[in-house]
């Protein structure tokens, strides 16, 4: 749940460092072996093997608690409960790039920074009604599948405290500039840890944008109990074939994960195919 395409970043941090220093006992034994011949060499090997190196390794420990623990437990529940299957595809994005360039001046006049995310959100909201299993959840206790009739999309945001997923409600009923302003506000407040609990609940589908820091494809973990999540790779120019010729063209890698108990592979493939239509030429969003 990862982001030079839209608004979110997916920074990765390393928390463990290792350093080693020579063990004095082993060094002394080795020197003895060098001067005393082969029997001493055998003793040197034994002493080196028995040497305790735990106090020579530097390990930094951090508490596993708070937001990090909450994220970890949610990820584990999702991975261990829902059998994940992923579908990867690439959307032609020349029309998307052009549409954003044409609308950016208007957005700036309104004081709104327009990214690609609102376009993707609108495209997802346009496609989901045709694939209701992607906007659902499984109620195991009741033995029922719940199909949502509203389209509340979570947007994964990387923060210093960990991954947060603020929710934009009723995406299908909002315009691009309204969505852009709302997403920008949620992202900023997520990074400042100013979101309310209500703003992190109620999503029916999630988008994560790992491509903002580079990369193409991944396997997004479901924001359980949702049955679908869309991961975005880096939108950039790549070699594409047009009329038998290799040319440079903007493309957007797509990675979709599903709860395979509810969603069939053919459904996720169809979802991606229709999504590509809207991303290739966003004018279809006006229909």
Where are these regions (language model features)?
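C-terminal catalytic/motor cores of large multi-domain enzyme assemblies
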Residues: 2, 6-16, 20-39, 43-287
């Amino acid at each position: 749940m990862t982001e030079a395409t839209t608004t979110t970043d997916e920074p990765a941090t390393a928390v463990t460092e290792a350093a080693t220093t020579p063990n004095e006992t082993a060094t002394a034994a080795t020197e003895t072996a060098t001067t005393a011949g082969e029997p001493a060499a055998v003793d040197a090997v034994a002493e080196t093997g028995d040497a305790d190196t735990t106090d020579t390794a530097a390990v930094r420990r951090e508490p596993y608690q708070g937001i990090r623990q909450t994220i970890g437990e949610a990820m584990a529940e999702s991975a261990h409960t829902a059998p994940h299957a992923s579908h990867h595809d690439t959307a032609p994005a020349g029309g998307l790039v052009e549409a954003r360039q044409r609308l950016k001046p208007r957005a700036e006049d309104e004081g709104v920074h327009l990214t690609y995310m609102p376009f993707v959100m609108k495209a997802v909201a346009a496609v989901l009604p045709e694939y209701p299993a992607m906007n659902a959840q499984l109620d195991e206790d009741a033995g029922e599948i719940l199909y949502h009739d509203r389209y509340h999309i979570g947007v994964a945001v990387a923060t210093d405290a960990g991954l947060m997923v603020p929710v934009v409600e009723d995406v299908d009923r909002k315009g691009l500039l309204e969505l852009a302003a709302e997403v920008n506000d949620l992202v900023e407040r997520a990074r400042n840890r100013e979101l309310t609990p209500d703003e992190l609940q109620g999503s029916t589908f999630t988008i994560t944008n790992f491509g903002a820091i580079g990369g193409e494809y991944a396997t997004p973990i479901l924001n359980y109990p949702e049955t679908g999540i869309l991961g975005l790779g880096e939108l950039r120019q790549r070699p594409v074939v047009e009329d038998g010729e290799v040319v440079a063209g903007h493309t957007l890698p797509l990675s979709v994960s599903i709860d395979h108990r509810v969603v069939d592979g053919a459904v996720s493939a169809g979802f991606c195919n229709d999504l590509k239509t809207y991303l290739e030429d966003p004018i279809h969003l006006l229909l």
